[in-house]
């Protein structure tokens, strides 16, 4: 079981990469080096199915464009007593075949059969742009 989430405030894959690289050091003290942490309000009820084998699929500009492996899920309580879930993510951002996705609130579960496939290592910028255009037209 995977997760899918809107990447709010980010307009491209490259911007997400930059954001991740700039903020990785924020979490060193809590979770170690080379991780990215996304804090969300709700702990997944299906966490046992996800840790170490799932990814979070990022929706940017109305399309799923990449995924990031989930290493683990950790409970967090802020100083005011509110409970959260820290999603500890591997540093890798893996491009996927662009797949259209309408806006939604929060995160959602994503079945493995519904997840877009990863792009091959030999994909180039032209094929990415073409795939994005075809996805916008609903053809892939």
Which residue ranges define each predicted feature?
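Long, hydrophobic N-terminal alpha-helical segment
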Residues: 1-37
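A generic structural signal for short beta-strands and their flanking turns/coil linkers
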Residues: 2, 52, 83-85
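Generic secondary-structure boundary/loop-capping signal
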Residues: 3-5, 39-40, 61, 67, ...
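Short, well-structured alpha-helical interface segments that form or flank functional binding sites
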Residues: 11, 52, 129
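Short, intrinsically disordered, mixed-charge
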Residues: 21, 25, 75, 136-139
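Short, well-structured hydrophobic secondary-structure segments
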Residues: 24-66
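Aromatic- and Lys/Arg-enriched surface recognition patch
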Residues: 67-116
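Well-ordered alpha/beta subsegment
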Residues: 106-140
């Amino acid at each position: 079981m995977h997760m899918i989430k809107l990447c709010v405030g980010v307009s491209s894959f490259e911007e997400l990469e930059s954001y991740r690289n700039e903020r990785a050091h924020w979490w060193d003290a809590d979770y170690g080096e080379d991780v990215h942490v996304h804090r969300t309000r709700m702990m997944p009820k299906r966490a046992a199915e996800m840790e170490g084998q799932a990814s979070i699929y990022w929706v940017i500009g109305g399309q799923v464009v990449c995924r990031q492996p989930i290493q683990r899920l950790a409970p967090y309580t802020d100083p005011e007593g509110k409970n959260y879930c820290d999603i500890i993510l591997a540093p890798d951002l893996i491009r996927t075949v662009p797949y259209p996705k309408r806006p939604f609130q929060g995160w959602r579960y994503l079945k493995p059969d519904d997840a877009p496939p990863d792009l091959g290592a030999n994909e180039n910028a032209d094929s990415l742009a073409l795939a994005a255009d075809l996805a916008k037209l609903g053809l892939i």
